[in-house]
Structures are given as C-alpha cells and as structure tokens.
C-alpha cells in the first residue's frame, strides 16, 4: 500500500510525524508537506513563482507552497506511481462545518480526490490537543477498513477525532457538515511602526450543530466521518433558475 501524506501545519508538525510512523506499519509512506504553517490556505495553488521540493533529515519532503501544491506536485511530478491513498493530517484543531471551505488540511485531501485517489482529511478536535495517539489509531482503523472493503469509486472523507483517550471514544458515526455563525469581526491594531493592521477574527460559534452533524458527534465523544463532494452546484436554486431567467 502506497500512502502520500501531507498537511497544512508544516512538515515539522507533531501530527504528521505521528501519523507517518503509524502508517509505516501498513505500507510505504511518502511525506510531502509545506515548509511552514499554511493553515487556512484552502485549495490555492502557487502560480506566480516556481515550487522547490526539498528533503528534510528525517526523510520528509517539504515544498515552498500550499498543501494543494504539495499533493499536486507529488502525484503529477514526483512519484513514479500514483499513491493508493492520500491522507492529510493529523491537523491540530478541528475542521468541521464551514471550516472545510478554508482548511488547508481538507484541501490537500481534496486535491488527491480530484486526481482520482481515495483521500482522507484527519483532524484532532483540539489545539494543540493531548491525544494524537487516539487520532493515529482511529486513522489506522479507517485505513484498514478501506483496504479490506474499498469503495467502488474514489472517496473523500473528512474525519474529526475528539481529544480523549482511545478507550473513551463512544464510537464512529457518519455525519453531515454543520455550520457556524459568521466569523468574529476583524481586530484592528497598530504595529510598533505605527501602521494600522488587521487580524482576522476567530471562527464563530456553531449555529447548525444538531444531531447528525459533525459538531454534535465530536461534542458527544464520537469520531465524525463526513463524505465530501466537490460539486458546488446549488441544486435547489437550479430547479428555480430557468423560470427566473425566462419568465
């Protein structure tokens, strides 16, 4: 089994190191991750400059680009064979609801999915979190299940793991994405040189967090597994649009 592992926290993050060690028990692991923290990079590609691929002393590869760059470069330009699975994580902090739109962790897995490879995005729902070992064990269990019973077509799964000991997890459930309120307003400040600067505000509280959502599952101590789709079509509006365009 050939695994391509990436993240958005950077190649030096504890989460990717722990997951790489775990996945090595199941197959060959290639790590290609950003050279620095690129949280919130979403699905952006670097188009204004060339990318450089370097190798760290621990054998990991790092790129001066985004998480999407890392997976795209690895699959289309670095690896001799397409990986059997792309895994992004383990992220330090949850990626639930609207977070998935901005998340570099989810974006790296999305790129693998777009390239035809089954892909997982894995996040520990706490920052920094105390139980990376739990997230590693959950990921390995899901990977084994995918190896034993593969889906009929490439699948993109977003996994969020409660920050608790493995034996305290209540189970694993299929969920849909919840939704947050809008983010808090930007914070205006002045830097030491007297320039006015702005910090993006914190994520808003969960708004749609009822039963069946990823927020609810994690809050109740369950691992949340949400299948994601790339189709952004608004089908409800699509049904009404022809009559609106041609009254």
Curated annotation (Swiss-Prot):
Cellular component terms (Gene Ontology): cytoplasm
Cofactor: a divalent metal cation
Cofactor: binding comment: Binds 1 divalent metal cation per subunit.
EC category: hydrolase
InterPro entries tied to this protein: SurE, SurE-like_Pase/nucleotidase, SurE-like_sf
SUPFAM superfamilies the UniProt entry points to: SurE-like
Localization, UniProt: Cytoplasm
Location (main, coarse): cytoplasm
Pfam assignment, any one: SurE
Reactions that this protein is recorded to catalyse: a ribonucleoside 5'-phosphate + H2O = a ribonucleoside + phosphate
Binding, a divalent metal cation: 8-9, 39, 91
EC number(s) given by UniProt: 3.1.3.5
GO molecular function: 3'-nucleotidase activity; 5'-nucleotidase activity; exopolyphosphatase activity; metal ion binding; nucleotide binding
Superkingdom to which the source organism belongs: Bacteria
Assigned keywords, A-Z: Cytoplasm, Hydrolase, Metal-binding, Nucleotide-binding
Family membership: Belongs to the SurE nucleotidase family.
Known function: Nucleotidase that shows phosphatase activity on nucleoside 5'-monophosphates.
PANTHER family in alphabetical order: 5'-NUCLEOTIDASE SURE, 5'_3'-NUCLEOTIDASE SURE
NCBIfam families: PRK00346.1-3, PRK00346.1-4, surE
Name of the protein this chain belongs to: 5'-nucleotidase SurE
Species in which this protein is naturally found: Laribacter hongkongensis (strain HLHK9)
Gene for this chain: surE
């Amino acid at each position: 089994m050939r695994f391509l592992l990436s993240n958005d926290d950077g190649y030096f993050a504890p989460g990717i190191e722990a997951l790489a060690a775990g996945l090595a028990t199941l197959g060959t692991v290639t790590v290609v991750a950003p050279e620095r923290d690129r949280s919130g990079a979403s699905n952006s590609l670097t188009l204004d400059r060339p990318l450089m691929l370097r190798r760290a002393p621990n054998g990991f590869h790092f790129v001066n680009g985004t998480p999407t760059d890392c997976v795209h470069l690895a699959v289309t330009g670095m690896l001799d064979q397409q990986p059997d699975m792309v895994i992004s994580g383990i992220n330090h902090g949850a990626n639930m609801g609207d977070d998935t739109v901005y998340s570099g962790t989810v974006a790296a897995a999305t790129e693998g999915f777009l390239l035809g490879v089954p892909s997982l995005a894995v996040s520990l729902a706490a920052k920094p979190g105390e139980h990376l070992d739990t997230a590693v064990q959950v990921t390995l269990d899901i990977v084994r299940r995918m190896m034993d019973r593969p889906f009929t077509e490439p699948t993109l799964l977003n996994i969020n793991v409660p920050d608790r000991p493995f034996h305290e997890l209540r189970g694993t459930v299929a969920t849909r994405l919840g939704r947050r309120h809008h983010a808090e307003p930007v914070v205006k400040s002045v830097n030491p040189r007297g320039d006015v600067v702005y910090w993006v505000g914190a994520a808003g509280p969960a708004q749609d967090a009822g039963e069946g959502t990823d927020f609810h599952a994690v809050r109740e101590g369950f691992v949340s597994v949400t299948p994601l789709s790339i189709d952004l079509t608004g089908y409800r509006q699509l049904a009404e649009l022809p009559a609106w365009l041609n009254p």
